[in-house]
Every structure is written in C-alpha cells, then in structure tokens.
C-alpha cells in the first residue's frame, strides 16, 4: 500500500489540551487538533501557546494533524517554509 500524500500547512498553537494534544489555528483560519510527532517527543521539543508550527494533515481527515516542526524566531524553516 502506497503512502498517501500529506498536506503540510503552517499554523499557530492557540490552546494546550490534555494528553499532549494542541488546538492549532491554520493559516486559512481553520482550527484543528494536533499532536506532536514522535521525533519531537523523543528530542523533548516543547510546544507552547503562540508557537508557529508546521502541521501534516491527511486528506481523509482535515480536522486532525501531526505537528512536525516548531519554527524558531529568527531562523528559517524546513524546505523553504
């Protein structure tokens, strides 16, 4: 089975929820539920309210996503974001 094409969008964390979940407002003003990716948990990368993040969404459920990158002020992002 081939891996489906993931959508990557930029957003801002607006709320911290239980069980390491976050409410993220995307650039297009939609709000989704997001969780941190495994590598972010492994490397103990903190995500706080107000952080700019990169979220992967599957085309099958556009209400949930995986936070894959936290943008740092003054630095570039992955892949030219």
UniProtKB/Swiss-Prot annotation:
Protein function: One of the essential components for the initiation of protein synthesis. Stabilizes the binding of IF-2 and IF-3 on the 30S subunit to which N-formylmethionyl-tRNA(fMet) subsequently binds. Helps modulate mRNA selection, yielding the 30S pre-initiation complex (PIC). Upon addition of the 50S ribosomal subunit IF-1, IF-2 and IF-3 are released leaving the mature 70S translation initiation complex.
GO MF term set: ribosome binding; rRNA binding; translation initiation factor activity
Domain S1-like: 1-72
PROSITE patterns: S1_IF1_TYPE
Gene Ontology cellular component annotations, sorted alphabetically: cytosol
Keywords recorded for this protein, A-Z: Cytoplasm, Initiation factor, Protein biosynthesis, RNA-binding, rRNA-binding
Protein name: Translation initiation factor IF-1 1
Family to which the UniProt record says this protein belongs: Belongs to the IF-1 family.
CDD domains xrefs: S1_IF1 (cd04451)
Subcellular location: Cytoplasm
Subunit structure: Component of the 30S ribosomal translation pre-initiation complex which assembles on the 30S ribosome in the order IF-2 and IF-3, IF-1 and N-formylmethionyl-tRNA(fMet); mRNA recruitment can occur at any time during PIC assembly.
Keyword Phosphoprotein included in the entry's annotation: no
NCBIfam families tied to this protein: infA
Coiled coil: none
Source domain of life: Bacteria
